[in-house]
Amino acid sequence: LSDVVLGFDDVAGYESDRNQYFGCTTGRVCNRIAQGRFELEGITYQLYLNNAPNHLHGGNGNSLDKVVWRAQEQAAADGVAVKFSYHSPHGEENYPGNLLIDVVYTLTEKNELRIEYRAVTDRPTPVNLTNHAYFNLAGAGAETVLDHELQLQASRYTPADETLIPTGEIAVVQGTPLDFTKKQVLGTRIGELTESPFLGYDHNFVIDRQGAGVVEAARLRHPGSGRVLTVLT
C-alpha cells in the first residue's frame, strides 16, 4: 500500500508558500475568472487578482482553501463520515451573497472515498466548488509522474492565451502533444509544450461522448505498481 494523494504532514506545510492547493476545497469559484471580473444582474463585480491578471480559485486571504472550517462527525449508513461547514459572508473576496457550504467526506465499507458538496445562498452568486487533489500513483515521495500512462476520451481541447484563459476556440488534438486518444506515457511529448506558460500539461479537454449515462473520460496507469485511476462523467 502507498499514499497516492500528495499533501503535507502538518498545518504549517499547508500554510506555507509551497502549498499549491494540495487536497483542498477550492472556491467560491474554482479555476480562473478573466481579469477577475464578472457581471451579474446588471452589477459588475471586481475580484482580487491573485493570479494576475486573473482571479484564481476564489481569491487571496479568504478563499475556501485558507479559511478555517467547522468539523463535525456525521452518521453514514455505509461507513464513517465527517462534515466540514463554512459560512462565507456577503462580500468575502468581493463575491455577492452569504454562502453556507457543507462538504461531507465519507469513507465507505467498500473503501470508497466519497465527497459531497452542498451550498446555499441568499442571493444570486457564482459557485463552482471542487477538490484539488494531486495524484502520484507511484506513491507519495516518488520523484516523478512522467512514467505514468494516460488515455483520454477527448479528440479536442480548448486553446488558451498566455494567462490560461480559453480563447473560445475548440481545436483538435491530432498531431499535437495533447493527443492522448491512444495510451501515451506522460513524459514522451511534454517537452514539446514550449508555448505553454508552465511548459507542461494544464489544459481543458473536450470529452467525446454519445448519448446519456456515465462514461469513462480518462484512465491513468502507473506501470510499476499496476495502479489505475479512472475518471467517469
Language-model features, listed with the residues they occupy:
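An exposed, glycine/acidic-rich loop-and-rim segment of catalytic or binding clefts
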Residues: L1-T233
